[in-house]
Amino acid sequence: MSSKGFEIGEEIKEQNFFIDNRLDASQLFFVIYLLGEKLHTISLSEERPSIRYEGSLFGVIGGTLFINGTTVTTGYSKVGELEVLVVSPQTAETMFFLINKEDYFVLGSDTIASIQTQGNAQVVIHEDTFIIDDNEEFVYFNNAPIKGHHYVKGVQIGDQILTHDFLLEKRKEQWKLTTFSETVVFNQESFLRQLPAVEFPKDFPKYRRSPRLRLEPPSDKFKIQKIGEAQKPSKNGILRAIVPPLGMLAATGVTSVLSGRNPIMMLGMGSMSVITATFTVSQYISEKKEHKIEDQKRKEDYEQYLIKAVAEISDKYDEETEVLHFRNPSPEKLAEMIETYNSRIYERMASDKDFLVVTLGTGNQASNLSVDSDINDRDNDEKSLRVKHLVEHFSTQREVPITLNLSTQTLGLVGTYPVLKTAVANLLLQVAFFHSYRDVNFLSLVPEKSYRKDWIQWRLLPHFKIQELNMRGIVHNAHTRDLLLNSFYQILNKRKQVLKDAGKEKPKFVPHYIFTIFDDSYLSGHGINEFLAEDMSELGVTVIWCKEDQKLLTETVTALVEYKNQSAGEIINDNKIYVAKSFEPYGDVPLLEKSLRKLTNLEHVEVEKNAIPESLSLLDQYEVKKVEELDIQERWASAEPNKSIKSLIGWRGKSEYMYWDLHERVHGPHALVGGTTGSGKSEFLTTYLIGLAINFSPEDIGMLIIDWKGGGIANTLDKLPHFMGSITNLDGAGTARALASIKAEMDKRMKEFAKFGVNNINGYMSLYKSRLNPKPDTKYPEKPIPHLILVSDEFAELKSNVPEFLDELTSVARIGRSLGVHLILATQKPSGVVNDQIEANSTSKIALKMASEQDSNELLKTHDAAHITQPGRGYIKVGENEVYELFQSGYAGVPYDPDDTTVETVDERIYQINGIGQTELVYDPGEEVVQGHDTSDLPTQLEAVISEVNRVFEASNLTLPAKPWLPNLESKIPTPEVTQTAELNTKIPLGLLDIPSKQTQENYTFDITDSSHTAIFSSPGYGKSTVLQTIVMNLARQNTPEQIQFNLIDFGNNGLLPLKELPHVADIVMLEEVEKLQKMMERISSILFYRKSLFKKVGVASLSQYEAKTKEKLPIIITILDSYDGLGQQDRRKEDIDNLLIQLLREGAALGLYLIMTVGRVGAVRMSMMSNIKTKMVLYLNDESEVVAVMGRERVTQEEIVGRGQVMLDIPTAIQFYLPTHDGNDVKLLEAIENDVIKMDKAWTGKRPKKIPMTPEELSLEIFEEYSEVMQWQREQKIPMGMSYQTTEILGIVPSAQPYFLFAPMDDDQMLLFQALLLKQIAKIKTGVLLVDFNESFEEVLAHHSLTENVTLITDKNDAKDVIAGMVGYVKLAKKHENGEPMLLVISNLQDFIQKTNLPASDFVLALKNVYKAGLDVLIFAPHEYIAKSFDEVPKAIRQLKFTGMIGSRAYDTPLIKGTSSSREPELSIQDAYFVLRGGSSFDKMKLPELTKGENND
């Protein structure tokens, strides 16, 4: 339960259950004590109705307690192995009381008991002692069970005794008893019942400073008067009084004697003289007595005066003594005050004059009283000496605290370590008591060997927690030295820079550091020494040096204190002035660690200044819980932007709203906002802008964000209907775009105002809002133009990086007033950034926390903003201080939880504090305990308000204004959907144009028939191949292969390869494919020639004319050439290719043939080519001059973005080229292209363009025989032997088509291949074969190939006559024009055959010329050297025949081929040969199938 019950008795009556102060008894169901070897307590409440503990489940359902499923009532129970005591708040009661220690206070069942219970256990309290008897019942003392009789234990604060009937606790000042049933009887005479005593400050451990009692020592002036002088008697007065009468008597007597006169007469005269003398003596005696009485009275009066004066002085003197001791209590006294959490804790603040004033001990010092007297040095009588003694006594205060001010000094302490350790401990204790850890932090360098003995007890004191570093400020080894001193050095550097920037007015640094150095070895070689060599007080640091000898101290010491021993010390210097003031140092504080620990408990909560909250949420700012309560719809309806455009930016006091109104007649029209990093500048601007959205509809207010850094505010507000765009990434291209957009908006507004005859935005919007109730002959606008709030976050970056953009903003500030454009320029450092024009037009300024006083002065003309410490707090200044207010702005990023009913719960996680004072989690019970429910998935208040604004807008009939700033072009834009049409459609979407001067972004339509030949210039890696893909794919999607066809030539990195399977693509060729490229060029050339001839024949000049005249459709053929400059200048093919391309550029467009090519360098294209390229597009080029060469000086500033380029419309215009698919994902782009290609390939069943005929690189016999043409040949009893390189047609032996078929290999290996291949192929036909191999040339091949049934092998030369006879028979049939049985005669070696048969050359030639006509085909094998170059009659003769054959030699090297060829032709591979017809007059290079090793070894 909370400490509320400690305050007033009424609350005790309402809630009188105090078992656990942490729990609210009203929410509590049961408290369960588990009675085992150790007592455990479980509390079940509304917040936590069930818990599992050590395998047992405790829970409350419907007010009933269940333990492991068993119902349990209050009191003692046993559930299985568990013994429990269940307590219910409904039947329990807690009371507090006092007892007489000398009496026996009994709790038990005896009738004499002070508190009579039903149980047998008995507890007796007497003289601070417990006497406990369990009497066979359970009793727990401090959670441990007690068994037996007369268990005696001394009473300690915190002791607890649990029995069946009660829980007894000893508190600090009272006894606390909780009884568990209503049967307990109280003997009220045995104790004094009380309200619970307050043991801790209110809201403990939170602590707030109390109003300080500021006592000043009296300074009265006193002057002690000396005693008045006594009246002195006349000197010889008695003689002067009696001598004359006596003299007269003597003279009379002498005269009488001498003259002889009458003696009687003389007697009379003598008597008179005697009488006169007698009276005179009597009078003298009387006066002397009176003088004595008066002198006595004088002395008595003076004594009374002295008593009164001394009493008066003593009162003031004692008052002064008390004040001195009050102001600076001894450390021991402070420990007593800490024990009771005295209200004087943390009473001193940095602004107090006694800030960091400490006392070193007690001694004598001059009194503040002025006591003087008028006694001079010559007055030495007793009274005077006494007065002098009094004056001397009251002029000195004795045994009073001797103080020293540490705030502006460097202190040097001299003495032994034990003495100095005590002295420093006492100093730090005083500082820690009187000064908050928010104002003062400690950093001490102590010896490693004495850390655990002397300093470890200080480790938890919050003053030793360096707030800026989150580390403990005790350096006691090398590890802590490295961590702390390096970080502290950085703090000092920052402060030094702030001090340097501050100028004349010195800043006050918080916290102030007390830097105590016992062991300076840690400083060796450290950069911090440069600061220690100077006065550090200006940096908010007091250094205390502790040395055994004065000689070891540094020269920076301004206060020097010497401790001679534990009981004698002397202040030698104070503020560099010799004072020689002795004192008696304070001794060690008893139980210092206890005092430190108690002081550590406090969490200092500072009092709110000016009632401005330290933090404020967005909805708190409006004092609502739900966004619906904002009444946004009503606010929009009642808004009058022509009079005010105010927004609530925060509070200037408790519920005192602070509005900012940029209307030109209030705080506007423009403003400056300043705030350093962490000041909450972006959050403030967000709060201001969302406030505008709350108060005004999108028709009234729009906002445009300029953010040099990108993101930021724009990302948080882009969902608002008021949001009109963001200008980010202001590099070269972005700047030009932004300038054009802003200028276009200003121009648009001026034109619109002029159009409707108004001169400002108020007049325009008044007309707009009046359109629903029109007046005759009045024009009304149909579109709203809102006030535009133009926010530039960090415009200092703009000035340094994009000065021309800031110039445009300056122009906006100058002319935007009447146009409804309001400029807010925000920056971290306004110094040197704000020019005169901006300053003159920025009526209001907002300054949040500024980095320096100079920056604050730049905005506010005061230093106030430099001293702000809280994010979101700032000053608003309008004009010349017409408004000057401090405010706290609302923060919109807090979770939106309108149903929040926060319940404080106990965080059960356990942390350990490591060696440097940081916390580390060591135990987590399973889930993080948070205050209230989990808010991690909740939207922020900003998001909730934006959603509400959108809801209100969507429910309204308001018109969304046109946006002046369109979003930056996306870097990846999928191509729009295109569909195929029956008619040819050459117009395709190619990219998105960005035209800021017209405030529009629109599709760029590319029409090949209009754009004609096109060149795309781009450096490598910027998407030129992707543009080609987009062109090809979109044209292919819209048209069939009968309408558009493509020739793909890729001189780059296979960018066109994904398109090769399109049904529209004739073929694709790479630069390295020499032969295929040559064929592609020939194909293009032949098409040009064919169409020119065709058009000439029809009598037309262009494709459109041809189609109109003949009604015949010809496909448009587009040659796509990627990376033209990949064809190097040294390439021998370049000249031919360029010539063909020039011809295509000149003649192709009219014939329906177009070229689209990409080029990496403008200079790579010949002028003759460039002049014939109608359309030029540019992507990013590394050389800016090339962009100028293509686009001119008005080029668009380049952006280094893939796919970003420019095209020439009326002027160069930026474009983002579309991706070739509808999926904008890079990873899936290639896959998407392939899928689309496959779909189109499968969908098209019509006629396709012919591929470039090419033999495969690998042509195995299996692949060869799978060709349909090969299979057709075999069905027709032809013998396929290979494939034409030029046409890929099948070449081989066609029966009855030639006098003979010649095999002329270059070497034995090729001979074996020819032989093996022939055997393989003749095995596939049914025609009979006669293999004549007299010299066994086929022996090696036949060893691996078995002959089929249709082959007869003749090796015996005796069979030669039969062979010749057979040939003669066929000759005869030929002459009769008859056909014999089809037969193949294979002569394995011509030279050997002639030798063995002795057949004359003429007869052999005659046979060859005729036998093939009758059905006998002769196949002759002869080495090339023999058949081609021998002068024997037979080879010489048969060379003249129109034979067909396979020649293994280069064309240049053989006379068997009649035609021109190059000597640079490479040697033929074993798989290559020339296929010759008509005796060599026609020839074609062919590729032979490759026989695998297995096939050769069949």
From Swiss-Prot:
Leader peptide range in chain numbering: none
Domain of life: Bacteria
Cited PROSITE patterns: FTSK
Gene3D superfamilies, per database record: P-loop containing nucleotide triphosphate hydrolases (3.40.50.300)
A Pfam family that the UniProt record links to this protein: FtsK_SpoIIIE
Any GO MF annotation of the entry: DNA binding
Binding site for ATP: G675, T676, T677, G678, S679, G680, K681, S682
Alphabetized UniProt keyword annotations: ATP-binding, Nucleotide-binding, Repeat
SUPFAM superfamilies xrefs: P-loop containing nucleoside triphosphate hydrolases (SSF52540)
CDD domains, sorted: TrwB_TraG_TraD_VirD4 (cd01127)
Segments forming domain FtsK: 655-857, 1001-1188
Keyword Iron belongs to the record: no
UniProt xrefs under PANTHER family: SPORULATION PROTEIN RELATED, TYPE VII SECRETION SYSTEM PROTEIN ESSC
UniProt-recorded name of the protein: Ftsk domain-containing protein CA_C3709
Organism: Clostridium acetobutylicum (strain ATCC 824 / DSM 792 / JCM 1419 / IAM 19013 / LMG 5710 / NBRC 13948 / NRRL B-527 / VKM B-1787 / 2291 / W)
